Structures are given as C-alpha cells and as structure tokens.
Amino acid sequence: MASITLTPSEKDIQAFLEHYQTSLAPSKNPYIRYFLKLPQATVSIYTSGKILLQGEGAEKYASFFGYQAVEQTSGQNLPLIGTDEVGNGSYFGGLAVVAAFVTPDQHDFLRKLGVGDSKTLTDQKIRQIAPILKEKIQHQALLLSPSKYNEVIGDRYNAVSVKVALHNQAIYLLLQKGVQPEKIVIDAFTSAKNYDKYLAQETNRFSNPISLEEKAEGKYLAVAVSSVIARDLFLENLENLGRELGYQLPSGAGTASDKVASQILQAYGMQGLNFCAKLHFKNTEKAKNA
C-alpha cells in the first residue's frame, strides 16, 4: 500500500478540500483536522499541517499538491521512527515492542553492522549486535511480561489492541526524548482503520502522522533496528523466565511448546504457566488435556 506524507500550504489544503468535499468523513483522531475517503485512497490532514495519503491511488491525489512519483523521498533518506514487535506468535515469553529513531547519516554504520529484519538473522547475530544498537541508536523499548499480558487480555485489550497500545506508547515516549522524525512507520500488524479504532482508547497521543506498511523491516533501517532490539529483548526475557522455572522455554507455539507447557503445568500448576506463557493460546488447553 502506497503511503505519502506531504506538507503543503494551507491554500493548497483548502483547495483540495473544496475539490473533494463530498469525500469528507468523520475521524476519531483528535489530531486529524479533516479525513477523506476517496476511491483507492484515504487522506488524513493533521493539525500539524502534514497530510498522509494512503492506498493504491495515493500518488494520483498527491499530484494535486505538485507531487511526482519520481521525486518521492524514500524513508531511508529521512529522519525516521520505525517500530516493530516480537513475541506475538510465541506461547512462551512476553511481548516486546521497540521504536527506534534513525537518521540518514547512520545508514552506513547500520549496514556495516549487518542490520536487517530480525527474522533473517540468527539469534547469535542478534545478541551480538543488539547491545551496540542500544548504545548508538535512540530508541524506546517496552516489554509486556506474560503475567501482565494475561492480566490485560480479555479485560481491556485483545491481541491486536494491546499491540496498538504498546506501539503508540513506544513512539510517544521516544518523541518525548526530543527526536524530530519526518516520518513514522509501523510494521503493519493490522489495518489502518483498526489501528485508529483502538488508538482512540489510548491516553498518550501525538500529532505526528503514522504510516502502517507491510514488510517495513525490509524497507526502513529504523524498523529493522527496532526488529533486532525487540528480538533481543524477547530472547532475554525467554531465558530469564525459563531460568526461574528450571526449564528451557522454546520460541513459537508448536509441539515443542506443547510439551514444555504440559511439564510446567504438572510442576507448578496454572500459576506457573501464567508466569511464563500467554494463556489464551491453544497450547494451554493442549497442556491441560495432555
């Protein structure tokens, strides 16, 4: 899905609104002045003056403001915040979310370090480069422990809305540190409509427009950095939880997790699983019936 961020003049904004006034739609985001649902695109006009165009027809509508596709500035050439999460698909371990701020002058350093999507790197490589990234790159890391995850899921949050809350909070806290991104990219885990719906429940908000992009870790180094740091945080948490229980906790939610879950249930009961696992996964019922 194409995503374009522009900062046109107020005169151009008003001309755009007049031209497409029949496409105006309501928005629950207090930082969006105007929201338009157009054929093959949505347009969010923020109080900050920025405009976010998303969808297959984004370039067409951006041309109204003089935008040309050949002039599109890649996210790699902008000061950028990127976010990613790790642990969502694993029965054991917490949920780690990281927002990282990367500037173009850091790109060579990151490439030489071998930064890429954590899914393409070995755990050994991640544990090796993550401490360097934590020291050199401004970031905000959040970890929701399994016990806290189990406490909030089904009460205030579901598996998607809890990620919205964590991504939003990580970005908010990083912005509070004074970074000034020209773009904010989230590795898409839900639709923009769903994200905005759940975001309305959150207290800490910011006016910067965000872009949800699929496979963003392969497009933006800031997202790749977040992916690596989040993976390292998740692995560290997995090790620490296992050490306290005396078990080696596997990542993922396959048969290996079923086996260990059954053993922990026999040794510690549900209290043990609540300490180290996400209970709403099917692995819990499998462990009970083993």
Curated annotation (Swiss-Prot):
Manganese or magnesium. Binds 1 divalent metal ion per monomer in the absence of substrate. May bind a second metal ion after substrate binding. Its main location: cytoplasm. Its EC number is 3.1.26.4. The keyword Hydrolase applies. GO terms for biological process: DNA replication, removal of RNA primer; mismatch repair. It is found in: Cytoplasm. GO terms for molecular function: magnesium ion binding; RNA binding; RNA-DNA hybrid ribonuclease activity. Its cofactor is Mn(2+); Mg(2+). InterPro entries: RNase_HII/HIII, RNase_HII/HIII_dom, RNase_HIII, RNase_HIII_N, RNaseH-like_sf, RNaseH_sf, TBP_dom_sf. A divalent metal cation binds at residues 84-85, 187. Residues 78-290 form the RNase H type-2 domain. Gene3D superfamilies: Ribonuclease H-like superfamily/Ribonuclease H (3.30.420.10), TATA-Binding Protein (3.30.310.10). GO terms for cellular component: cytoplasm; ribonuclease H2 complex. It catalyses: Endonucleolytic cleavage to 5'-phosphomonoester. Keywords: Cytoplasm, Endonuclease, Hydrolase, Magnesium, Metal-binding, Nuclease. Belongs to the RNase HII family. RnhC subfamily. Endonuclease that specifically degrades the RNA of RNA-DNA hybrids. This is Ribonuclease HIII. It comes from Streptococcus pneumoniae (strain ATCC BAA-255 / R6).
